[in-house]
């Protein structure tokens, strides 16, 4: 377990999800997230430990440590992005490309299958990336871990130059809202 005191100058983002807002920091090669409701950090740590015992490769997910941040429970992960990489959420990619809110667009579709296929088709057309396997892994993990907070701001691609690739990670943190 770690214990870290971090000043407000390291705060990266304070964005809400349907489960609430959590303070996120980036310092010395780590991303930190303080618990908001209690035990979110422990959940992320346990899920990342669980993933070590699956058939996933180490480069497909983020490992978390649990600890304390400014005396409050939370978690941290090593920064998973290289200098020339950027995390782009599905929401932001769609907004940048189309100028509309992807969640509102798919909310008007009749079935979940239509919504998923629309997103898959958009990512393929925009990035040349087939995300079927990625979504299958993320949604399977969500089902196993009872994650009910999956949305378009915590599904993301890593962009390096003009290339995109997927990384399975355990939860919205610390990239939520990126």
Spans of features found by a protein language model:
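Conserved ATP-binding subdomain of kinase catalytic cores across diverse folds
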Residues: 1-99
